[in-house]
Amino acid sequence: MGPLTFRDVAIEFSLKEWQCLDTAQRNLYRNVMLENYRNLVFLGITVSKPDLITCLEQGKEAWSMKRHEIMVAKPTVMCSHFAQDLWPEQNIKDSFQKVTLKRYGKCRHENLPLRKGCESMDECKMHKGGCNGLNQCLTATQSKIFQCDKYVKVAHKFSNSNRHEIRHTKKKPFKCTKCGKSFGMISCLTEHSRIHTRVNFYKCEECGKAFNWSSTLTKHKRIHTGEKPYKCEECGKAFNQSSNLIKHKKIHTGEKPYKCEECGKTFNRFSTLTTHKIIHTGEKPYKCKECGKAFNRSSTLTTHRKIHTGEKPYKCEECGKAFKQSSNLTTHKIIHTGEKPYKCKKCGKAFNQSAHLTTHEVIHTGEKPYKCEKCGKAFNHFSHLTTHKIIHTGEKPYKCKECGKAFKHSSTLTKHKIIHTGEKPYKCKECEKAFNQSSKLTEHKKIHTGEKPYECEKCGKAFNQSSNLTRHKKSHTEEKPYKCEECGKGFKWPSTLTIHKIIHTGEKPYKCEECGKAFNQSSKLTKHKKIHTGEKPYTCEECGKAFNQSSNLTKHKRIHTGEKPYKCEECDKAFKWSSVLTKHKIIHTGEKLQI
């Protein structure tokens, strides 16, 4: 095989032929020429850049009116033959066949006149009248590269059988010199190499972002246009990528074909299984250059980096709130629509996020696969284990820029920030009351519905919040696991300990704008404000008396019911209120009440 020139891998058109091509076909020509040139360079064949390539890279018209021919480089000789021992001929064929046949095979220009090279392809009976002119010309390039002439058909068969064989044997003879990753075909290695070279040929006119592939640019443009051409027939939801629609459909079918060999858990996406496997290995390959923190997912690292930059590019058109991630914006939008598309098959409860449904489903199974290595405590969600681990480390990585206060969780920091802004985006449709947290709105709604789904197994008392049930349970055990380091006093709940600590510091960060009075708890400030507004939203259904606090209404109701939940352990006497029980106990202790 003799020395090659760039002309050997270029396609030539006459002026008449060039004028027959439409814009799409001319762009196709440009892509093929650039692709062929890059493949030759990547294969290690040194060549000075032809005028044609320079012209195409600059986006200029390839036809020269003076010369009346396509600007093909002068016969620059490649510095060497294709070295058969370094680059097996068969795989070189694979590379160019992928470019010329597979990727550019459907141009549909029926009456394009052909030059000699294409006629020779007809002699080989490669295209029995079914292919169009431009495709034939592209295939002619391949003929020139491999010097097949009349045996191109045989070369195709051999190439395809070899490629088929590689799939079954899983041989990966082509190795990336940059990162060591191996591939079965040289075309795949060529595509992969762009990751290292960062060669971006397709630029977005809207934002300037560049991409290696025109198809990737096309997908990216949909971010700006908002186009969502792929629609789910089941629920009508639309997507900007077909792959996202395929993933979404599995929600309706419940299909989970990907199984973890370690624990047997199944997933509806292969990527989710891959992510899950890292739980078993403990591997954290993605490290933050800013603070050194490591993560098991690249997406988590990307999200984490925004802590350092403060970037929030995704804005809600409804209320103006900005988010670091597009997924968070999507989740947030459901607040405005009230939509709950994710339904539990066991109990029928609906959720606005698939993650919330997954969290809920564990209630029915009772499964707790995530165990803490420090104390052995098990959790039903990996996120809960992560949250729990901070108890052992004491780490508080999330700091408020406004006041310097640090928090263990980003969600707690987000909630805290609202103290400074005073924002209350969550409004009750029933009574128009607004809240700074969606969870508080959910809790509040139960006042109107009267729903109390959380029941104590000991005494049968029901609560509208799970946290209230947890607190109540401790009244049966008298357990006080949270101890003050300053005075040694024990508390049943960490929140009570936090409130107690302020006694020692004297801090009162919550100030009334009306009268200037300061409080050590936000709840006390909220209660105090009602003095100025005169608001009494809690009304007794029995007698119509109104109260400014729900706790006062609860106490008042006991007058009508006769309920006496506070019992003296010493003499079994019962009382309506805990304060009266406290006073009563002094009779038994002999302690003198301080007035």
Curated annotation (Swiss-Prot):
Keyword Cell wall biogenesis/degradation: no
Domain of life the protein comes from: Eukaryota
Primary localisation category: nucleus
Pfam family, one: zf-C2H2
GO biological process per UniProt: regulation of DNA-templated transcription
Record keywords: DNA-binding, Metal-binding, Nucleus, Repeat, Repressor, Transcription, Transcription regulation, Zinc, Zinc-finger
InterPro entries xrefs: C2H2-ZF_domain, KRAB, KRAB_dom_sf, Znf_C2H2_sf, Znf_C2H2_type
Residue ranges covered by zinc fingers (C2H2-type): 146-168, 174-196, 202-224, 230-252, 258-280, 286-308, 314-336, 342-364, 370-392, 398-420, 426-448, 454-476, 482-504, 510-532, 538-560, 566-588
Record localization: Nucleus
SUPFAM superfamilies assigned: beta-beta-alpha zinc fingers, KRAB domain (Kruppel-associated box)
Tissues where the protein occurs: Widely expressed, including in testis.
Gene Ontology terms: cellular component: nucleoplasm; nucleus
Cytoplasm recorded as keyword: no
Gene3D superfamilies on file: 6.10.140.140, Classic Zinc Finger
Start and end residues of each KRAB domain: 4-75
Chain's role: May be a transcriptional repressor.
Family listed: Belongs to the krueppel C2H2-type zinc-finger protein family.
Name this polypeptide is given: Zinc finger protein 85
Protein's organism: Homo sapiens
Organism lineage string: Eukaryota, Metazoa, Chordata, Craniata, Vertebrata
Gene that this sequence comes from: ZNF85
